Amino acid sequence: MSTRLNFLPDERFAPLRASLKERLQKMADLITPENFPSLLDYRSGSLLRDVFAAVRADEGSVWILDQAKEHLVVSYASGPHAADIMGFKQPLSAGIVSTSFISEQGFAENDVYRHELHSRLLDEKLHVTTYAMIVAPFYILDACRGVISCVQLINVRHEDGRSVPMEEIPGGFSMGNLDAVKRSALVLTDLINYLLLRTAIGWEAN
């Protein structure tokens, strides 16, 4: 028979809670697309690579809101085009990733290249076509700071104003795949929040 272990707040720390919360908020506000990669370690990197592989994505990215709050910027990328994707800016006014961020809702879409919300800016930069996409909001502390996305890609040709796949289309993404990416986003949030907390209190932990 198992028993539940309940931890209670230590009231000795009560006078420090407001100061700690303020310090954590200031630390979070200093996070930018450019310095976000420094928050990732082997655990967070493995988490992202594993979930992208599990859902059979060709590419995966973490997008972080810029300081001007005008663009989402790719601050982590995994896949064959990772080096070309890093630093790419997506206006908040366009694209499924921006819609997910603004609404704080996850998306799992197939036939993305035919979707009216899909922004082709990154496809055109990389000379690829996005077939399927998952996007999940990503939080630091209590605020949405960006999204995690992953895609499946295809080659298409254009006939009579239509995009026609040149190869067998991928399997696409399911709602179960979206749930997997959402869970990984929650774990990544916990890892970064933990890093901020132990840095704020000067706790050296492995």
Regions from the PLM with identified roles:
Residues M1-Y42, A53, V187, L191-N206:
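Signal-transmission linkers at sensory-effector interfaces
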Residues N6-P9, F13, I148-N206:
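Juxtadomain coupling helices with adjacent low-complexity linkers
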Residues T32-F36, L47-R56, V62-D66, A82, ...:
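Short regulatory alpha-helical segment in sensory/regulatory domains of signaling proteins that mediates
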Residues L65, H71, S75, A82-L121:
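Regulatory sensory and allosteric helical modules in signal-transduction proteins
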Residues A82-A83, N110-A132, E159-E167:
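Signal-transducing coupling segments at domain and membrane junctions
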Residues Y131-Y139:
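A short, aliphatic-rich beta-strand micro-motif
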Residues F138-L141, N155-V156:
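Sensor-regulatory modules in signal-transduction proteins
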Residues C144:
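Glycine-rich acetyl-CoA-binding "A-motif" of GNAT/NAT acetyltransferases
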